[in-house]
Amino acid sequence: MKRLEGKVAIVTSSTRGIGRASAEALAKEGALVYLAARSEELANEVIADIKKQGGVAKFVYFNAREEETYTSMVEKVAEAEGRIDILVNNYGGTNVNLDKNLTAGDTDEFFRILKDNVQSVYLPAKAAIPHMEKVGGGSIVNISTIGSVVPDISRIAYCVSKSAINSLTQNIALQYARKNIRCNAVLPGLIGTRAALENMTDEFRDSFLGHVPLNRVGRPEDIANAVLYYASDDSGYVTGMIHEVAGGFALGTPQYSEYCPR
């Protein structure tokens, strides 16, 4: 029997990158996966690929710019399937043109990004937990970032918002542990998604990798493997974890890249 047989999962922003890889991993293990996304056309392409791999997936409309859809997507899935077992909060964003350091960054944009990213966990979790309680438990997996625990020279809004998600993760974990609802966060490092690669120079990438002991850019599947672990009963005695999946980034001293060159 597959690890997630009979389970119903929701994955936000799941038509590409980490979200898509996570949806595919959950479906491969038997979950019925709802792709929460803006574009039904893009979602259907992923659904077709999942079907080819022997899995089952469906589309539910979600748009981070339409706050009410955080709740409506959950309610639509619960109404259609009668249960929700797994929630993967993958959505997160910034504005590379305005999210800079404290004095150079745009103040209004700082608070917009903070609100956007925190509510991307708060609202769907709040909506899903009552449905998880009805079926005796569930698992919430929040996608954060290594930048939430290692300060950055830029992207202050993104990093602070993801730090808040780490705290929210642990608060949810504690508050609902007695209901058998687990909540964990996965913190990606440098992952080779299109969005990430389009926003970095080769020079930046090489400099960053100098501080990654495993000496490679991560793959979306690396994150999906962690998501699958927390979604399944393999982690049935684990909650409140802030799990870095970053190739060992920041393990070394500041001189690491000098004394252990690539």
Curated annotation (Swiss-Prot):
CDD domains of this UniProt entry? Answer: SDR_c
**Regulation of this protein's activity per its record:** Activated by metal ions such as Mg(2+), Na(+) and K(+).
Q: How does activity depend on pH?
A: Shows a maximum of activity between pH 7.5 and 8.0 both in the oxidation reaction of cholate and in the reduction reaction of 3alpha,12alpha-dihydroxy-7-oxo-5beta-cholanate.
On induction, the UniProt comment says: Up-regulated by bile acids, when grown in the presence of deoxycholate or chenodeoxycholate.
The lineage's top-level taxon is Bacteria
Q: Which GO terms describe its biological process?
A: bile acid catabolic process; lipid catabolic process
**Catalytic activity field:** cholate + NADP(+) = 3alpha,12alpha-dihydroxy-7-oxo-5beta-cholanate + NADPH + H(+); chenodeoxycholate + NADP(+) = 7-oxolithocholate + NADPH + H(+); 3alpha,7alpha-dihydroxy-12-oxo-5beta-cholanate + NADP(+) = 7,12-dioxo-lithocholate + NADPH + H(+); 7alpha-hydroxy-3,12-dioxo-5beta-cholanate + NADP(+) = dehydrocholate + NADPH + H(+)
**Keyword Nucleotide-binding attributed:** yes
| Binding-site list for NADP(+) | 13-18, 38, 63-64, 90, 158, 162, 191-195
The EC class name is: oxidoreductase
Q: Which residues form the active site?
A: 158
Q: InterPro entries, from UniProt? A: NAD(P)-bd_dom_sf, SDR, SDR_fam
Q: What quaternary structure, including any partners, is listed in this protein's UniProt entry?
A: Homotetramer. A dynamic equilibrium between dimers and tetramers seems to exist.
Matching PANTHER family, A to Z? 3-OXOACYL-(ACYL-CARRIER-PROTEIN) REDUCTASE (PTHR42879), 3-OXOACYL-[ACYL-CARRIER-PROTEIN] REDUCTASE FABG (PTHR42879:SF2)
Q: Which family does this protein fall into? A: Belongs to the short-chain dehydrogenases/reductases (SDR) family.
Q: What is this protein called?
A: 7alpha-hydroxysteroid dehydrogenase
From the UniProt record, report the name of the gene that encodes this protein.
hdha
